[in-house]
Amino acid sequence: MSMPFSSLGRYGLALIVVLCLGYLQTASAMSIRELRALKRVNPKQGADFALYYLVGTMEATVNADQAATRAGAAPRICLNGRRLEPSMAVSIYSAELRRNAELYEADMPVALVMMNALATVYSC
């Protein structure tokens, strides 16, 4: 009785699965702890990298809420003509962490904090 996969084929398949899982890991959201570590580990550029990440997270959160609204979900973020600029990302994020410090654990994603912050500041 022959096996459908040779041992080389099984190792190749296992390698592909491991690589795919590795790529899935790189696509995960940054946690609060990782964002703080980014600032500490790289003193010269860490703050800039964190700022870029927060701005991107803020824009992605607004776009995701708008897409969900177009798909029929109730909106959570309503700008209503108020301004939302990239320079506001850090202050909105930091204010949410201060306001609800007991709710957030270090392993929670930054995107969750940003969604709650924007929903609070720009409530519907």
Residue ranges and their predicted role:
Residues 2-13:
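Bacterial N-terminal signal peptides that target proteins for export
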Residues 1, 28-30:
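Absolute protein N-terminus
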Residues 21-26:
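N-terminal signal peptide c-region/cleavage motif recognized by signal peptidases
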Residues 88-124:
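Surface-exposed, polar helix/loop patches in the mature regions of secreted/periplasmic/lumenal proteins
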Residues 30-94, 117:
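Short N-proximal segments of mature Sec-exported proteins
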